[in-house]
Amino acid sequence: MINVGIVGGTGYTGVELLRILAQHPKAKLKVITSRQEAGTGVDDLFSSLRGQITLKFSDPLKVDFGKCDVVFFATPNGIAMQQVSALLGSGIKVIDLSADFRIKDVAEWEEWYGMSHTAPELVAEAVYGLPEVNREKIRNARLIANPGCYPTAVQLGFIPLIEAGAVDENHLIADTKSGVSGAGRKAEIHTLYAEASDNFKSYAVAGHRHLPEIRQGLSERSGKPIDLTFVPHLTPMIRGIHATLYARLTRDVDLQALYESRYANEPFVDVLPAGSHPETRSVRGSNFCRIAVHRPRNGDTAVILSVTDNLVKGAAGQAVQNMNIMYGLPEKMGIQHIPLLP
């Protein structure tokens, strides 16, 4: 069994981790921390976990992770980087679901996240946890930087075109939509029911924190810098990401064959039949990314549709997928949930 600790177990990502790991046949939850809920039973806070988890939340300043093999951080940005070094020094592996170790250029990270990085020496070591790209590196990693929700959907949508050198990489467009759970569980005006319901809006058009992460990943696949216009939107649904991606083709290519070939052996990327239009509900509660490719009127623009659940493939599910790879387990173990309908 893999003994697991979770730092920050009360947010939406944290409770999704709990839901998945409580059912994982090779994982045993040992420690779950929360500053505000220390001493509270996990199942008292989340009734969905009654009969599944009997642990209480622990004070993160008093907890001992010595019995853990791996620790997940489901914390706000800036927390993991303060604690990871000590855990690694004790032989404990870390999977960080925050953005602390995703961007390799520390100065760029500090610019986007507005704080000084306290563990820059670990940034180079951290492996970016997108299995469809870095599976072999993940196997031997001590520290995983779990990708963000938008970056997962956007990168998986663009990667086959980028790797094939089939598009103008200076004019990529990502028009993305997210459910309100992507904003987290904290109370904010823009996610109140009366604000988010019956409403649809764009935000962070001038620059979103996930932009440098996406650019970094796609540039690595290209071998040279790419340019991307990234516009996120908030939609009146709880969970889900829908990315509509546009790219100008530079040569003739069979998009359907390209995508089916690239993802043929990927257990969680589903390339839909030609002409399909994936729905966010088709991945709700699952670790799947479903993709459809289009070339309107056989023109020179490729339109790629990519959908994920922001809390699963965009966060907790992908983190557990990375854990499975790190420990040599079947990659699909514990994360084969069928999407919820209706």
Curated annotation (Swiss-Prot):
Active site residues according to the UniProt entry: 149
Biochemical pathway: Amino-acid biosynthesis; L-arginine biosynthesis; N(2)-acetyl-L-ornithine from L-glutamate: step 3/4
Family according to the record: Belongs to the NAGSA dehydrogenase family. Type 1 subfamily.
Catalytic activity: N-acetyl-L-glutamate 5-semialdehyde + phosphate + NADP(+) = N-acetyl-L-glutamyl 5-phosphate + NADPH + H(+)
Recorded GO MF terms: N-acetyl-gamma-glutamyl-phosphate reductase activity; NAD binding; NADP+ binding
Matches recorded under Gene3D superfamilies: Dihydrodipicolinate Reductase, domain 2 (3.30.360.10), NAD(P)-binding Rossmann-like Domain (3.40.50.720)
Alphabetical list of Pfam families matching this protein: Semialdhyde_dh, Semialdhyde_dhC_1
CDD domains: AGPR_1_C, AGPR_1_N
One GO CC term on file: cytoplasm
Subcellular localization(s) per the UniProt record: Cytoplasm
PROSITE patterns: ARGC
GO annotation (BP), single: L-arginine biosynthetic process
Keywords assigned: Amino-acid biosynthesis, Arginine biosynthesis, Cytoplasm, NADP, Oxidoreductase
EC number(s) from the headed UniProt entry: 1.2.1.38
Name recorded for this polypeptide: N-acetyl-gamma-glutamyl-phosphate reductase
